[in-house]
Amino acid sequence: MKIGKTLWRYALLYRKLLITAVLLLTVAVGAELTGPFIGKKMIDDHILGIEKTWYEAAEKDKNAVQFHGVSYVREDRLQEPVSKAKEAHIYQVGMAFYFVDQAVSFDGNRTVSDGKLTITNGDKSRAYAAEKLTKQELFQFYQPEIKGMVLLICLYGGLLVFSVFFQYGQHYLLQMSANRIIQKMRQDVFSHIQKMPIRYFDNLPAGKVVARITNDTEAIRDLYVTVLSTFVTSGIYMFGIFTALFLLDVKLAFVCLAIVPIIWLWSVIYRRYASYYNQKIRSINSDINAKMNESIQGMTIIQAFRHQKETMREFEELNESHFYFQNRMLNLNSLMSHNLVNVIRNLAFVCLIWHFGGASLNAAGIVSIGVLYAFVDYLNRLFQPITGIVNQFSKLELARVSAGRVFELLEEKNTEEAGEPAKERALGRVEFRDVSFAYQEGEEVLKHISFTAQKGETVALVGHTGSGKSSILNLLFRFYDAQKGDVLIDGKSIYNMSRQELRSHMGIVLQDPYLFSGTIGSNVSLDDERMTEEEIKNALRQVGAEPLLKKLPKGINEPVIEKGSTLSSGERQLISFARALAFDPAILILDEATAHIDTETEAVIQKALDVVKQGRTTFVIAHRLSTIRNADQILVLDKGEIVERGNHEELMALEGQYYQMYELQKGQKHSIA
């Protein structure tokens, strides 16, 4: 299972949004990273540019500065070539500026004494006559720079505003695409679960499945929303910063480039430990969800049997284990986050000082203040995305583990092949041919089952608990598939039908009726838009639920909450009956359907069933044998085999297992009476 490829495949579903976001981000980063270059130009060309060579100009121009009645123009501002015989310089010494009206051979350490400017560089030293400039005179020399500085400031401000809008755009698009990816992923997971075989859920608590759909996908959402955004943003920032560093100084840029393999090695070491801890955390979190779900569902039993302490102890063990691994993860994050970033940052600045400090000792290698400013600025900016990446390592690993759990579920083979409901109603003839079945390999629960139910017949399945009654119906619905033999409907093997087609012929009523949150009507129709309100009411009337509708203020629109907890078990079963009948099935399955119904309600349903059985093949599982006396066929099962078959009179005449069960129940009834 390749987690990265699957995550990438989901991202490509919304590649237009992602590509647009990355383009916007690239433009925004480019605009923002232009700032230090603008600062460098302002420092070198305008603020410190006053120390460049000045020439006495023969004619005035717009860049000329008047000083003592003479016009001076800076070397890089000359519009026309002039004689360089008359050269002048301005030097800063401390907080003061001095004018030197002659050529200067070299630059170096500067001192001023008795109107003399002395410049020393190594063994060389030379003194020049110098005049200290007043504030007004200094301002005159800076005046030509004001326009350029204002333009650069406006450009910098404009780029910042420009960058903000593009940053907002990329952030919005990345968030939107991430939300859509997770929406799609959750839909896929939930849809896949709908198609999973019942066998999958036999050994998997519901809380664990819920945790994968909610908690794990939410962790993946953090990957796309936060981690992906941070990594893409930081990656583009780092690329832009390294490009700028190479433009400024290739040698030092290569030194800074060593940070990249350090981060890679860092991530490898981190993942080695974080992956294990996160797997434990997510697994225990699923167990906690399962435990909470189980406890809430069984709260009545827990309180009735005073099992609160034991339940709390089991929960505390899980919670303590979760706390332990969370602390281990915290220690790992503390060790490998800001501390290491600060160490790398300090090493980078040591290299910077070493490089520029060494260069300053060589007159030919003196670096401008603007370049130094830009380098320091870019180095500071470089560690912002590095810090961002490091801070997301924990979320990245958590998301990878969560993605692995979600994709593991998605890779589970489902049994619900694509198919449409049957276009024509089946006749209802059902045949089992030498069927054998085992839930666990080597432990057969059905052995060589063979029987035929003709159209419209009622077939009752009786036997002790574990004899295989429900397993026969599980095979008929294809909740499970038989290892041997075949099951046919109207002469056609059910294994040659899609499950959608097969189940469109059948309706089922279980021993424990399950109602969904919604209304009485939605529980009957299961939100099938093809079913009209009148059809819903008719189904309820057929099963004798009309008194229930009259009792409820809103009729079929009466809300149903928490599995129908406000309704009696008999009322819930009536709605379950109506649900089965509303879809007009050719085959009706009643799995202990009257077990939770009082005698009066059972009498109502029995009358209704006499009507709805007409034209339908009905399978009944019943422990109360008095309810199946009129069955056309009764199959008695024992240890997975049919040991007796026939109608009530025939089986009573045999005086076998059926006779014994019937007489036993009859005796109990008389005893109670």
Swiss-Prot record:
Q: Which residues form a coiled coil?
A: none
Give start and end of each ABC transporter domain.
Answer: 430-664
In this chain, ATP is annotated as bound at G463, H464, T465, G466, S467, G468, K469, S470
| EC number(s) recorded for this UniProt protein | 7.6.2.-
Report the membrane topology from the UniProt record: Multi-pass membrane protein
Q: Which GO terms describe its biological process?
A: response to antibiotic; transmembrane transport
Q: What induces it?
A: Induced by several classes of structurally unrelated antibiotics, such as erythromycin, fusidic acid or linezolid.
Supply one GO CC term from the record. plasma membrane
| InterPro entries registered for this protein in UniProt | AAA+_ATPase (IPR003593), ABC1_TM_dom (IPR011527), ABC1_TM_sf (IPR036640), ABC_transporter-like_ATP-bd (IPR003439), ABC_transporter-like_CS (IPR017871), P-loop_NTPase (IPR027417), Type_1_exporter (IPR039421)
Keywords of the record: Antibiotic resistance, ATP-binding, Cell membrane, Membrane, Nucleotide-binding, Translocase, Transmembrane, Transmembrane helix, Transport
Query: Partners and quaternary state?
Result: Heterodimer composed of YheH and YheI.
Further information: Overexpression reduces the sporulation efficiency possibly by modulating the function of KinA.
Q: What does this protein do?
A: Involved in the transport of four structurally unrelated drugs, including doxorubicin and mitoxantrone. Transmembrane domains (TMD) form a pore in the membrane and the ATP-binding domain (NBD) is responsible for energy generation.
**Which family is it part of?**
Belongs to the ABC transporter superfamily.
**Could you identify this protein by its name?**
Probable multidrug resistance ABC transporter ATP-binding/permease protein YheH
User: What does the record give as the organism's lineage?
Assistant: Bacteria, Bacillati, Bacillota, Bacilli, Bacillales
The gene behind this protein is yheH
